[in-house]
UniProtKB/Swiss-Prot annotation:
It comes from Arabidopsis thaliana. This is Beclin-1-like protein. Ubiquitinated. The interaction with SINAT1 or SINAT2, and the presence of TRAF1A/MUSE14 and TRAF1B/MUSE13, mediates its proteasome-dependent degradation. Keywords: Coiled coil, Cytoplasm, Cytoskeleton, Ubl conjugation. It is found in: Cytoplasm; Cytoplasm, Cytoskeleton.
């Protein structure tokens, strides 16, 4: 059989692939056992003749001895150690082999295996037979018993090493070096400790020990006995004082218990009083809180108007809203026509309510017909225009006419309110002036018509229209005592019929904000 080889810087050592794969127990790297490493090293460096290195056959006179053994040979270990020292035995009945012409001219290559076989001891001196199985470039036959013996020897060697070193075997060379260095260091430490102990023992042995004489010993004994009597007397005195202190301690504990009882009774009565006081305070605070809430509610009711609660006008981004209905459309936000119609219905109902309150003093050429989400506007010629959609965005003249008429009605009501303020001698700065100027069909320059108009401009015009309507609503609330017909509760008598709320709000409060609240 062919043998594997491990490359080395100076030589190669044959490896038997049939051997099991050993693993280093420290670094867990795989190991390959190559015969006996020490034997292989000595073999390549001119090994001396000995029993452990007996694989060289017949010295220089043999074929194996006359030829340099390099990568061409694998020497398997013997099953049993040789029984005698000296030259390895030869086969019985065979003389010293001499190199012939055919063998000496051939280089011995990677096809030779030296296998030791066990033979019974002969009468002449117990020599063993050595069988050489040689095959030029052919298959080699392994010795099964020799292989098993090799495994047993290695296993036994590892067990012995493990028992003696208390370290798991086998180990690779690097781990063996590390372990060796560690053990050497421990040995050095132990050696230093031993030397220190020996020095200490020698020092103690060299010291002189003073031995007291009989007289000195008796004198020292009397002195110690005297000290002992004094200590006993002190202990008795201390025990007496301890008894007195314990008696006083019991009296103090009795007094302390009585004091604790009195203190517990006092705190119990104090806690009961505090509990009653807290209960009365909580009842008082609850009544005061109810009074405060009732007063705030009354004040809120005094300032509340049904129109402000019924028609809240706010801003929602780019849209003006009334009762949370958006009025207008944007390219990015497609508001449904149902929501726009509902917003117009609320706006028409609010303006119609305020206009009817001042009739017949307030006469407007435009009449509003609030009909839910389908309001209509009637002009001076009794022509009716629908103020609801959907309508054609590019041709909606009737819808545009209805919005223009609504804007005209709102402007007429604002002019009427301004004239009422002037009649009541209100300063011009506090008179009703719409924040966004209305001119025909435009609010602050933005047209309220939808035909041929951008949705952004139309939405802004509607937003400003609702803001003007909110200003008119606040003026109406501040200058009237308006209540629905079904109302049974009237405002307090201390509020006058005209101008009271409007005057109390001051100049800033008369200008409502259109911001979202």
């Amino acid at each position: 059989m062919r043998k594997e080889e491990i490359p080395d810087k100076s030589r190669t050592i044959p490896i038997d692939p049939n051997l099991p794969k050993w693993v280093c127990q420290n670094c867990h790297h795989s190991l390959t056992i190559v015969g006996v490493d020490s034997y292989a090293g000595k073999f390549f460096n001119d090994p001396p003749p000995s029993a452990t290195q007996g694989s060289s056959i017949h010295g220089a006179n043999s074929v194996l001895g006359s030829t340099r053994m390099d990568n061409s040979f694998v020497v398997l270990p013997r099953h049993k150690p040789p029984q005698s020292q000296g030259i390895p035995p030869r086969p019985r009945g065979a003389s010293s082999p001499q190199p012939d012409a055919t063998q000496s001219g051939k280089a011995m290559e990677e096809s030779f295996v030296v296998v030791y076989k066990s033979e019974p001891v002969s009468d002449s001196g117990g020599s063993h037979n050595l069988s050489l199985e040689v095959g030029q470039n052919g298959p080699l036959h392994s010795n099964t018993s020799g292989f098993n013996a090799t495994i047993n020897v290695l296993t036994r060697a590892f067990d012995i090493a493990r028992t003696q070193t208390q370290v798991e075997q086998p180990l690779c060379l690097e781990c063996m070096r590390v372990l060796s260095d560690k053990l050497e260091k421990e040995v050095e430490d132990v050696t230093r400790d031993v030397e220190a102990y020996e020095a200490c023992v020698q020092r103690l042995e060299g010291e002189t020990q003073d031995v007291l004489s009989e007289a000195d010993f008796l004198k020292e004994k009397k002195k110690i006995e005297e000290e002992e009597r004094k200590l006993v007397a002190a202990i008795e005195e201390t025990e007496k004082q301890n008894a007195e202190v314990n008696h006083q301690l019991k009296e103090l504990e009795f007094k302390g218990n009585r004091f604790n009882e009195l203190e517990d009774r006092y705190w119990q009565e104090f806690n009961n009083f505090q509990f009653q006081l807290i209960a009365h305070q909580e009842e008082r605070d609850a009544i005061l809180a109810k009074i405060e809430v009732s007063q705030a509610h009354l004040e809120l009711l005094n300032k509340t108007n049904v129109l402000i609660d019924a028609f809240p006008i706010r801003n929602d981004g780019e849209f003006g809203t009334i009762n949370n209905f958006r009025l207008g459309r944007l390219p990015a936000i497609k508001v449904e026509w149902d929501e726009i119609n509902a917003a117009w219905g609320q706006a028409c109902l609010l303006l119609h309510t305020m206009c009817n309150y001042f009739r017949p003093k307030f006469q407007c050429q435009v009449k509003i017909q609030p009909m839910g989400s389908y309001p209509r506007i009637v002009d001076s010629n009794n022509e009716t225009y629908e103020l609801f959609g959907p309508v054609n965005l590019f041709w909606s003249t009737r819808y545009d006419k209805a919005m223009t008429l609504y804007l005209m009605c709102l402007k007429d009501f604002a002019d009427f309110a301004n004239s009422k303020d002037q009649e009541n001698n209100i300063p011009p700065d506090n008179c009703l002036n719409l924040p966004y100027k209305i001119e025909k069909d435009k609010v602050l320059g933005y047209s309220i018509t939808q035909s041929f108009n951008k949705q952004e401009s139309w939405t802004k015009a509607l937003k400003y229209t609702l803001c003007n309507l909110k200003w008119a609503l606040y003026w109406f609330v501040g200058n009237t005592n308006f209540q629905p017909l079904s109302a049974t509760v009237s405002l307090p008598s201390n509020i006058s019929a005209a101008g009271s709320l409007y005057a109390k709000r001051g100049p800033d409060s008369s200008k409502p904000s259109c911001k979202k609240t």
